[in-house]
Amino acid sequence: MRTTMTARARRVLVATAGSLLAIAMVGAVTASASTTTTTTRSSGSPIKLATKYASGLRMAMDATYPPDEFVQNGHIVGFDADLGMALGKVLGVKVTLVDATFDTIIPGIQDGKFDVGNSSFTDTKAREKVVDFIDYFKAGEGFYEQANSTKTFNGLKALCGHSVAVETGTTEQADAQSQAKLCKVNVLSYADQNQVNLAVSDGRADLGFADSQVAAYIVHLSDGQFKLTGTPFETAPYGFAVAKGSGLAAPLLAAVKAVMASGQYKKILDKWGVEQGAISDPTLNGATS
């Protein structure tokens, strides 16, 4: 989860039946890179948007985090990108997705450079002091294993007596190592997600441990090689960030509700294999910690 002001870029590579399927992720895209989609208002009651936004919304994201937002063939893609486009359609305005370094997005919203932050922001009480959040998704940490495994893992205590593969430098590595101080856990740390997946596929590790939506995406692209096990834990809401007093919070919340009601929300999450993080009741500033 992106709980700090530093983006945690990942290379997500999935091992499949003797070959590797790479999920494209370009980490060296300039902050000025953007993709623009012109939308028209969907049918139904119009959502009022301040006149100053009639020309469109600049939506900032750090496109280094598949499956949420990443660059593929020169365009920003991912479920966050798709949701942003869907919101533009409901609001009837042009949406420009702007690739920006993660820790510049909230300051950019505050100084008017960006209208919306859409970059897997965990909604926290600390962040709510400076921006408003429209919560639309939940994410945490999750496990995945070989599809033919008969074991079920729920929560950190389930790691006891098992080998778990993690990516070096992640929250999951820290959590697994903390659990290893309480019981016997063989923590296998690797430099990238590809090596983590290989450790699970060849049986060195009983399970892989990653952010819940990343784990879901790995399974989604594994061609039946992996499956999720247990339920996500340490979950927290993701939110679209807007400046306080911008007049965007209420219309964006209404737009999120409309996208959900239309079924488009479910279609987008299903497309990216992250339906496990779906919520049914979007809220304004719903942080719990």
Regions found by a protein language model. Name each.
Residues 41-120:
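Extracytoplasmic small-molecule ligand-binding "clamshell" domains
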Residues 42-48, 171-187, 228, 257-289:
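Ligand-binding clefts/hinges and TM-proximal coupling segments of bilobed small-molecule sensing domains
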Residues 94-158:
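Acidic, polar ligand-binding/catalytic clefts
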Residues 63, 138-145, 216, 220-257, ...:
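Periplasmic-binding protein-like
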Residues 103-104, 120-128, 177-178, 201-234:
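A ligand-binding cleft/hinge motif common to bilobed small-molecule-binding domains
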Residues 82-90, 147-149, 163, 170, ...:
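Extended ligand-binding regions for polar small-molecule ligands
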Residues 63-66, 76-89, 121, 142-197, ...:
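Bilobed "Venus flytrap"/periplasmic-binding protein-like clamshell domains
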Residues 97-107, 151, 187-202, 236:
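Short helix-initiation/N-cap motifs at beta->coil->alpha
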